[in-house]
């Protein structure tokens, strides 16, 4: 029996040790290596996970279970506000940095009780690969922060869930700000208080967001309808962002919001089921969208578009892409969705000389992305 036990343990170790980065980043973050060939470590506590992610060593960190941060930093009860009403499906807001006081002075005041761990994510330092084993790697109640000059980071095959979903300003799933060479791949996010993904106002430089499942189903939302509003916010001052192969489901807005000075290549993504809008493009947002599928998205882009947008409207117009991207852009596909037709070409030269993700026909996306995006589908 002792030998059988030892063999079982050895088998588990061998299985765990087999976890490594799958594939390679396409697009702007091509070449990212994360922790490289560092010996994998397997945190067993939330404290170990925080330590591994936040130290100065190159690391491959493998998650084999759920790391639940709920309650680890206590709770706060304070006065917040109800900008969207007090119905049971409406999000309430924490008065973070006097947000309620300054921006929603007429909103009813309410008592809010939130988990402190969720309000600020785990710091991720440079040269890290954070990988999940199978479908078992979950971070619950706290997000990730890639900030302050961090670079060369891979986050792959994990889930981030349940971050104060009732409260705006309750926390973000993934924050990137003042960073470079970041690859977010096969990650599932669900039940998040604020943004599922946010690139802050400092330069995040080269970022690839691929094969992720952004799940906007929530019991609480700013639109009070079960559709999360705060999806993806790209607001950097000098950002090159590739979004490819993502499944963006059940949002009512900001999926994504693009502004600042952000060049976005949105290619082969699947947007499904929105009660509001998908794209919001502000000043300094430059968006090329090709080979995507929009299903049941009544408003694909909110008006007005204050930045620039190329929607790859037809095969003739799309030939202009060849000069700058090295291929003819793919048309997008639509099902029970609104219009999406704009052909600003002045910004396309910004793609010249960059690492550009390949593009497939939208018909491929329709059949493959929902079944292949997110954790455990790698």
From Swiss-Prot:
SMART domains membership: Amb_all
Disulfide bonds: 81-100, 90-224, 321-329
GO BP, one annotated term: pectin catabolic process
Keywords recorded for this protein, A-Z: Carbohydrate metabolism, Cell wall biogenesis/degradation, Disulfide bond, Glycoprotein, Lyase, Polysaccharide degradation, Secreted, Signal
One function term, GO molecular function aspect: pectate lyase activity
GO CC annotation terms, alphabetical: extracellular region
Protein's UniProt keywords contain GTP-binding: no
Any matching Pfam family: Pectate_lyase_4
Subcellular location: Secreted
Signal peptide: 1-18
Main location: secreted
Catalyses which reaction(s): Eliminative cleavage of (1->4)-alpha-D-galacturonan methyl ester to give oligosaccharides with 4-deoxy-6-O-methyl-alpha-D-galact-4-enuronosyl groups at their non-reducing ends
Residues bearing attached sugar chains per UniProt: 127
EC code(s) of this entry: 4.2.2.10
Class of this enzyme: lyase
Active-site annotation: 254
Family listed: Belongs to the polysaccharide lyase 1 family.
Protein's UniProt name: Probable pectin lyase A
Species in which this protein is naturally found: Neosartorya fischeri (strain ATCC 1020 / DSM 3700 / CBS 544.65 / FGSC A1164 / JCM 1740 / NRRL 181 / WB 181) (Aspergillus fischerianus)
